[in-house]
């Protein structure tokens, strides 16, 4: 590899001496590859079109056959063949054919101008009459046909993955369409996107362990946000009736095919709405964005057909658990009763689940969650695990909350928001007690947030959607790392360790 780099560096120096500086400032393409392919699909085989074009891109392949050479040039939209004829290039400038065939390698960025021709084999080509080195590559490309077989390398060096994998490029193109589609959908309905702090003095809005940092000038410990909820609710208190933020969230937790410590979510708050209104908003928005990104609301994910056409199934957590286990948690009045019934049904009973409501949630996670393949709104959660949600209007011990599950994964979470400041303080104090007892994911008491509620917050529906998981679904990607351009990775090796394997 070092020898190859040295050889390419010598070529770069030679180009410099020839006045073809290997790193150009600008180039002005007249067309993109896909545009040329579409506009000149009618050009017959073996014919030329006297249209002057200029294209730029990365050289992906090169074949030199005596007095002819064929390069494949790729830009963001597609590829086109470069037809290089010694006689034509030498007529423009002596030595040009030799220079381009000996000094240009696969991986180099090249700008060319010429006319169009279609080869006898039907390949639309630019017959090159002028060329310019735009950027000399000193490293070889991965194998064009096999791509990056090392999955870890795909994530660590995403730029290589994008060069050789059209599928990866399409994934991130769809991600961009999805993000812009969500913003457009909300903007068109008079929602305002307002940025909230990433650095916060209190980590709240979710049960999660935060990243901790320090502000040197203020000598102040700070947290990277684990949610945008509490600040967006402050904005509702301040009079913004429809507000959202789409951005990065940080949680100091484990990594898996579903979890990355840095991820993207959108949180949406609508005054005068509730969790039922948020269900309607969620299914309408996701269905429309899916239509824009995928061309329809029926998609294929990892061998399973998924129908995102509204309306979606709605079922309570109690109903789903009883359906899956035969256990009616509404009949249990003590934790001991629920625990005994769970053990008899073959369910695990974690000691940390210290109430009937927490055990209900455990039963749901163990027996129900993975089976929810088609989009399902799971509603009416235990109050113990929902400290920011409003008490249910007719079901004691529950809150007005739903989570959306698709292909067995939580994709969205929403509430009728808790706006009673006295109730909110009591619940956050209970959370603070759990935190003091060692629960690292429990929320603290944000006094300013409670004060904001005391100023007065209108009835509000709130929603959070995991963008990365939604992108996974719409791109048929099995891992969250496939849809995050640069996911956090374990170090390949540390100075005091042998290199890791796998």
From Swiss-Prot:
Residues the record lists as binding Mg(2+) 1: 403, 410
GO annotation, cellular component aspect: cytosol
Positions of Mg(2+) 2 binding: 410
Keyword Transmembrane helix set for record: no
Gene Ontology biological process terms in this record: lysyl-tRNA aminoacylation
EC number: 6.1.1.6
Cofactor note: Binds 3 Mg(2+) ions per subunit.
UniProt keyword list: Aminoacyl-tRNA synthetase, ATP-binding, Cytoplasm, Ligase, Magnesium, Metal-binding, Nucleotide-binding, Protein biosynthesis
Subunit structure of this chain's protein: Homodimer.
Family as reported in the entry's similarity comment: Belongs to the class-II aminoacyl-tRNA synthetase family.
HAMAP family associated with the record: Lys_tRNA_synth_class2
Protein's name according to its UniProt entry: Lysine--tRNA ligase
Source taxonomy: Bacteria, Bacillati, Cyanobacteriota, Cyanophyceae, Synechococcales
């Amino acid at each position: 590899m070092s020898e190859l780099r040295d050889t390419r560096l010598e070529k770069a120096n030679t180009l410099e001496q020839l006045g073809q500086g290997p790193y150009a400032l600008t180039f002005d393409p007249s067309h993109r590859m896909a545009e040329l392919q579409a506009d000149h699909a009618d050009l017959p085989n073996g014919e030329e079109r006297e249209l002057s074009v200029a294209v730029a891109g990365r050289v992906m392949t090169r074949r030199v056959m005596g007095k002819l050479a064929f390069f494949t040039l790729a830009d963001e939209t597609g590829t086109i063949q470069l037809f290089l004829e010694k006689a034509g290039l030498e007529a423009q400038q002596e030595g040009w054919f030799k220079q381009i065939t000996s000094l240009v390698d696969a991986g180099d960025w090249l700008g060319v101008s010429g006319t169009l021709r279609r080869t006898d084999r039907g390949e639309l080509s630019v017959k090159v009459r002028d060329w310019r080195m735009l950027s000399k590559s000193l490293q070889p490309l991965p194998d064009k046909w096999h791509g990056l077989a090392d999955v870890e390398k795909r994530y660590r060096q995403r730029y290589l993955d994008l060069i050789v994998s059209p599928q990866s490029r399409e994934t991130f193109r769809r991600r961009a369409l999805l993000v812009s589609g969500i913003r457009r959908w909300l903007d068109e309905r008079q929602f305002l996107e307002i940025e909230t702090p990433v650095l916060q003095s209190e980590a709240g809005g979710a049960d999660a362990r935060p990243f901790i940092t320090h502000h040197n000038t203020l000598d102040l410990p700070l947290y990277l946000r684990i949610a945008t909820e509490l600040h967006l609710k402050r904005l509702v208190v301040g009079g913004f009736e429809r507000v959202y933020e789409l951005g990065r969230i940080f949680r100091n937790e484990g990594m898996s095919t579903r979890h990355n410590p840095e991820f993207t979510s959108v949180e949406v708050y609508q005054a005068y709405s509730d969790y039922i209104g948020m269900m309607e908003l969620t299914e309408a928005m996701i269905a429309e964005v899916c239509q824009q990104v995928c061309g329809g609301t029926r998609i294929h994910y990892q061998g399973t057909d998924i129908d995102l056409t509204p309306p979606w199934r709605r079922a309570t957590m109690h109903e789903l658990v009883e359906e899956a286990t035969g256990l009616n948690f509404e009949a249990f009045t003590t934790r001991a009763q629920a625990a005994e019934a769970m053990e008899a049904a073959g369910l695990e009973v974690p000691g940390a689940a210290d109430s009937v409501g927490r055990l209900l949630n455990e039963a749901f996670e163990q027996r129900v969650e993975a089976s929810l393949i088609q989009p399902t709104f799971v509603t009416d959660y235990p109050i113990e695990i929902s400290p920011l949600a409003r008490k249910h209007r007719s079901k004691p011990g529950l809150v007005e909350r739903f989570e959306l599950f698709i292909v067995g994964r939580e994709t969205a979470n929403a509430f009728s928001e808790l706006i009673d400041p006295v109730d909110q303080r009591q619940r956050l104090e209970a959370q603070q007690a759990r935190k003091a007892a060692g629960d690292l994911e429990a929320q603290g008491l944000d006094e300013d947030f409670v004060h904001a509620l005391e100023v007065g917050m209108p009835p509000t529906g709130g929603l959070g959607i995991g963008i990365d998981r939604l992108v996974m679904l719409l791109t048929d990607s099995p891992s969250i790392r496939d849809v995050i351009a640069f996911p956090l990775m374990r170090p390949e090796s540390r100075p005091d360790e042998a290199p890791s394997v796998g």
